[in-house]
Amino acid sequence: TTFRNSRKYPGLLRFLIARFFYTDAVNTVIIFMGVYVTDEVGFGTQLASVVMLIAMSFAVVAGFIWGRIVDRIGPKRTLIRVLRLWMIVFAWTALSGFLPVPSWTFWPVPVMAGIALSGTWTADRPYMLRLTPSAKIGEFYGLYGMVGRFAAILGPALWGLIVNTLGLGRPVAVTILLAAILISYAILRPVSDSPRDWSNKGTDSTQPAS
C-alpha cells in the first residue's frame, strides 16, 4: 500500500505524521477563532470580524516573504520557524483565556497567526517535494492530502469533546492544540530536507529543488 511504501523513503513518514499534528492544530484554530475571541477574549462580533480580517491580510502579504525565505534557507528550516511562531500564537491565545488580562493585549495574535498560516502552506509543499521521488509524487500526494483531510475532521471533533462533552473550556482546548504543535515540532526536527539520491530505490536519481 501507499502507506507502507512511504516507509521506504527517509523522513517521508515522519513528515506526514508531523503534518497531521500541525494541520490538526492550524485548521482547528481557524474554525474556532471567531468564537474564542468573543467568548474568551471579550471582543464583540464586529471586533471578531476585524481579527479575522487582520489575520487574512497579514497571511496574504507574508506569503510573498515566506516564499523568498523558503528559497533562501529551505523548507525545513522555514517550517521549523513557522512552528515556533505557532507556539507563541497558541500559548498567547490560551493565556488570554486563562488570565484576566485586558482584551487589547490579544491584538498581536491575529497578526502572528496570519503570518504563521501563510508560512505553513508556503513551506509545507516544498518540504514534501524534497522527501518524495519525482516518480512517486502522484502516489504520495494522495497520502499527503488524506492526512490533511483526516486532521481537518479530527481537530474540530477533539475541540468539541474537550469544550462541550468534558466541559474543560476553550483555553484548555487551545492548550491541547499547542501540544499538537510541540509534537509536530519534535517529530520534524530530525527530518532533513537535503536533496535525496533515489537511484537505490529504483526511481529517478535527481530530486527537484523547491
Show the residue positions of the predicted features:
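Helix-to-loop junctions at the C-terminal end of transmembrane segments
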Residues: 61-75, 163
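C-terminal ends and interior cores of transmembrane alpha-helices
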Residues: 84-101
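A membrane-interface helix-boundary motif in multi-pass transporters
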Residues: 161-181
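Juxtamembrane intracellular "pre-TM" segments in multi-pass secondary transporters
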Residues: 1-17, 208-210
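Short amphipathic helix-loop junctions that connect adjacent transmembrane helices
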Residues: 31-48
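Intracellular juxtamembrane helix-capping segments at the cytosolic ends
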Residues: 119-133
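Multi-pass alpha-helical transporter architecture, strongest
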Residues: 175-209
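Cytoplasmic membrane-interface "Motif A"-like loop-to-helix N-cap segments
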Residues: 72-86
